[in-house]
Regions:
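Accessory alpha/beta interaction modules
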Residues: 1-150, 160-162
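Short, charged alpha-helical interaction segments and adjacent helix-coil junctions
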Residues: 2-6, 10, 14, 66, ...
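Generic structural signal for hydrophobic core residues of well-folded globular domains
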Residues: 19, 33, 157, 174-177, ...
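Short alpha-helix boundary/capping motifs
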Residues: 44-45, 58, 154, 198, ...
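Compact structured core domains
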Residues: 148-173
């Protein structure tokens, strides 16, 4: 059953992505989670698709961000525990590396990347609000591999145990819908603004329709040909190229050639 547009919250992918399109809110959330400042955001892509090659499993990032210093941040909202987050994080990080290191470049040119999963449940099971993972030497815990990667899993269920006050209020808002801080009130205001936007409503309706059809036809695991057929139909109905790209995951250049 598709959730009504009026009932969407930050937990829902569609609304989360809409809110994260705001660079200020997106930057502040990342900094809050990492407890560190990041550079100026120069690129935000919502529902960003990466296809390494035709037969490979594709990746769709909720929010992919790049800052002026070249660092990448993937931010995911996760409400269902599919018990695969550690392996997904590994795959997502590899997809970023493969996609953004051009042929002929040196490995040292790989940009730092951060994979962040904001979960409404405890994915690790240790009752901690924040789990941060880096590669370290098992024989000498003080020695880091320094490969420029970091993975962070947030457990919103443990918001009461969160030491960072701002993060605690955000996680409480995520779980309860109660906006008590200036930051969460800004998020809630933006959500209400989105709900008043007729174009956003139509976009959600369209995406929901295609996703239901995709499940029925097996399109979620779908073939390249299915994606092309969907793109062709959408073009015939004069849908925007950017929306076709978002739904099918096909590159813009391929869509234009169809």
């Amino acid at each position: 059953m598709v959730k009504r547009f009026e009932d969407l919250t930050l937990q829902d992918d569609f609304m989360f992505c809409k809110v994260m399109q705001n660079p200020d809110l997106c930057k502040r959330l990342i900094e809050m989670i990492l407890s560190d400042t990041i550079g100026k955001i120069t690129y935000i892509s919502i529902q960003h698709n990466i296809n390494t090659y035709e037969q490979a499993k594709s990746v769709r990032f909720d929010v992919l961000v790049q800052t002026e210093d070249g660092k990448f941040y993937d931010v995911e909202m996760q409400v269902s525990n599919e018990k695969n987050i550690p392996k997904r994080m590994r795959f997502y990080q590899a997809a970023i590396d493969i996609s953004f290191l051009d042929k002929g470049n040196f490995y040292n040119n790989l940009n730092d990347s951060f994979i962040i999963f904001i979960c409404t449940f405890d994915a690790i099971g240790k009752n901690k609000p924040v789990y941060t993972f880096e590669n370290i030497c098992l024989e000498d815990k003080n020695t880091s591999l320094q490969d420029g990667t970091k993975k962070v899993i947030i457990n919103a269920e443990a918001f009461k145990d969160t030491e960072n006050k701002e993060l605690k209020e955000f996680l409480e808002y995520l779980k309860t819908g109660k906006a008590k801080s200036e930051f969460t009130r800004r998020i809630e205001e933006m959500i209400q603004t989105v709900k008043q936007n007729e174009q956003a409503r139509q976009e959600y309706r369209l995406m929901s329709t295609f996703e239901m059809d995709a499940r029925y036809k097996g399109f979620s695991e779908g073939t390249y040909n299915n994606k092309c057929e969907t793109a062709k139909l959408m073009k015939l109905k004069n849908f925007d190229i950017a929306l076709i790209k978002e739904i099918t995951g096909l590159p813009e250049s391929e869509i234009e050639e169809l």
